[in-house]
Amino acid sequence: KGLTSASGIDVMTHAIEAYVYIMATDYTDGLAMKAVKMVFENLPSAYENGANDPKAREEMANASCMAGMAFANAFLGVCHSMAHKLGAYHHLPHGVANALLITEVMRFNASDRPAKMGTFPQYEYPHTLERYVECADFLGIKGRNNQEKFENLLAAIEELKAKVGIKKTIQEYGVDEKYFLDTLDEMVEQ
């Protein structure tokens, strides 16, 4: 079950990051959005029922492939960068590390704080909030305005993580807060 949940949330993170990344294109968008939807529709059953639901497992494999094709061309974001460090330093499965970071990274990315970081024409203005809202719309997540849709998307992701046994904090995975803080500078420099 742990492998199913960790790899399933990793698939979702691949797809969401590929969709909102500045190198996303019309070609990668369809793959990413379909993969996100497939994860929401199939991961809980693949997790709960395992081999007893081969269709859900097949759909998760397909979602993984589509998300992979999306991020191979659109690339990934800071969540994956940080998850690699967090997982390596604190011996957490990669998908779990992504799961622990994704909604906080999304909240940061959707804010006005990220500044223009490149010469890509797609990034003349930050657009991540709008892209996250498009994800919410595609998943049928409602809200009175874009900010509420975004918050509801975050809540849906948190609910999905809970359904598949992902704990809420790094500390719940046995990482001591003092040790985490002591290794933070070294993690960022690597």
Identify the meaning behind each predicted range.
Residues 34, 77, 158-165, 183-186:
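Short acidic alpha-helix initiation/capping motifs at coil-to-helix transition points
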Residues 65-98, 190:
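Glycine-rich phosphate/pyrophosphate-binding beta-alpha loops
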Residues 1-74:
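Carboxylate- and glycine-rich phosphate/diphosphate-binding segment that chelates Mg2+/Mn2+
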Residues 92-179:
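Gly/Pro-rich interdomain helix-loop hinge
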Residues 30-34, 38, 59-62, 81-84, ...:
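Amphipathic alpha-helical interaction segments
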Residues 13, 19, 24, 37, ...:
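Glycine-rich flexible loops
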Residues 176-190:
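Short, amphipathic C-terminal "tail helix"
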